[in-house]
Amino acid sequence: MNPDKFLEQQKYYEAARGFLHKFQTNSGKIHKDDAGAPLGPDELRDLGLAISSCTMETRSVHKSNVKSFWSQLVSIVEPYKTDLSMLPEFELYPYIVDSFSKNKLIKPSNNSWQRLSGPPRVHLGEVVSAITQTLKCETAEVRSAMLVHNIVAASTYYQNIYLDSLAALLDVAPRDAERAVAKLIIDKTIDATIDKLAADPTGGVSCLIAFSGATTDDNFNDSLFRLCKEVSNCVEAAQSK
């Protein structure tokens, strides 16, 4: 392995270990799992917050290395995987990062998202029930952040697309898609134009959106960070109840 690449991976590995150590130090209870006993609701809550903190750290990690960071983290917490699988965000964040690293749109129909609004697979007390009830509504902030991320992702591999087609791709109403694209243009998050005089394939009048393809890694990173942050806020609010 290239020495520089090894040092880079080691850096993310140590960062991930640091977050887990913070949880172990603050809780002092995670070691009981060594004897095979499952983590209780309080431990799950604390570990969930540690996982959320790890996600925040990805903002400072270059896009090409985000997935490596997460794979290191997941390998470190492997002994607690059975307990962590009860936390919706543990399944969701790797899916978000995987989609992000491959420039794919994040689909609300993905099983990881569906589990956010489904019943807990194992009853773990009021903490997990509170998480499920809070996330069931899918907050406006999470929906908005997902929409922004998906538009930024779409701008990286579309040059021209009709508004109706983009809306279908994003799974939102055309009016919402147009409003979101316009805001991102004004904010300079994406470089695009909206042509309201373009004729669509059916002969009607529609909007044609032209992307320049100049989306930066920083903008792409920021869109992922915002989405993870909103999901973390939602989960943390539920866990604090």
Summary of predicted features, one role per range:
Residues 1-241:
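Charged, E/D/K/R/S-rich low-complexity terminal regions of large eukaryotic assembly subunits
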